[in-house]
Amino acid sequence: MPLLSCSQTFRLPPLHETFSVFPDNGLNPNYNACRAQSRAWISKYNVQVCGPKMRAFMDNCNFELSNAYVYPYAQPAGLRATMDLANILWLYDEYTDMQTGEDAAKAAVTVSKTLLNPEYDDDTWICHMMRDFYVNHIQKCRPNVAHRFIENFCRYTEVVGTEAKLREKNEVLDIPGYVALRREISAVRTCFDLVEYCLDLDFPDYVHKDPIFVIGYNAAMDLVFWANDLFSYNSEQAKGHAAANVVTVIMTSKKMNLQSTVDFIAGFCEALTFQLLDAKRALSLHEDPTFSRDAVRCLEAFGDWVRGNDAWSFATTRYFGPENKIVKETRIVKLKAPVEESVALKE
């Protein structure tokens, strides 16, 4: 188990300073119109799953705003797709957090059957939601992007079942094992697939297998989930779900206290940032414009994701509640008592 800290607070690192090396491209101007459309769409499904308190909580989190931060360049159709995906992921995550490993595995089967065969219908809300998303967006993607998205989304739902089983056992993985798992359960791969869609790119497999591109891709993906784990740690430890969080993993593996772990994460995020920048520079020297132009543009867009994700985390109440702006200014997080201010799915 992780070492306990006598302190009831911890100080967040200034990740916004680390991520300031990525340009600030502002908010997507299509935000308001796409947000209204996406919220109306997801409401058809969350009303079947969530109680009124949870729906109000999810509305206040404003997940759609995150997409305006991380896809500042997207045209309306692309931005709407990213918002719908974000709403799917948050709803699916909240739903499976309350499921056993067996039930989460059943949900994954429904997702896979639906995405691989849109004619499939088991009359569940998950099936109908995923079929809608496929028809509205994925069938409009170019072929390589569509194939990768389906593969990555199905993999995500399969691994969520693994996470649920670990949660049942309260098992804490080692650092390499957790990083490998988190790259899949974070669903960032599916979000990066939509980066290609929004940029009207359709990379062949050899780009995604290129060692330098992989380094940049993985660095960006890890930056997103390390930051998310850091920001969500307080809520997760209060709900008893912190075993599947990089903070707990490092505390346990390295026998560090909480603040030392947070500082370690800050240093690691700096190293990952340099990896992403170095990969972009290396690809810019490539003779093939698929790499020197298109792959570089994609990594630049991943930088939007990293910086925008950090900015949204303090613009929303998702992680820090109504104190989000105070936490942004002071960087001080007060540890919640168990289940304090936790909203159950059916409430």
UniProtKB/Swiss-Prot annotation:
Binding annotation for Mg(2+) 1: 93
Keywords: Lyase, Magnesium, Metal-binding
Endpoints of the signal sequence: none
Positions contributing to (2E,6E)-farnesyl diphosphate binding: 318-319
Binding site for Mg(2+) 2: 93
Enzyme class: lyase
Transmembrane segments: none
Listed cofactors: Mg(2+)
Motif DDXXD motif per UniProt: ranges: 93-97
Keyword Metal-binding belongs to the record: yes
A Pfam family it matches: Terpene_syn_C_2
Catalytic activity reported: (2E,6E)-farnesyl diphosphate = viridiflorene + diphosphate
Annotated residues for binding of Mg(2+) 3: 228, 232, 236
Family: Belongs to the terpene synthase family.
Function as written in the Swiss-Prot or TrEMBL entry: Terpene cyclase that catalyzes the cyclization of farnesyl diphosphate (FPP) to viridiflorene and viridiflorol.
UniProt protein name: Sesquiterpene synthase M422DRAFT_47084
Natural source organism: Sphaerobolus stellatus (strain SS14)
Lineage: Eukaryota, Fungi, Dikarya, Basidiomycota, Agaricomycotina
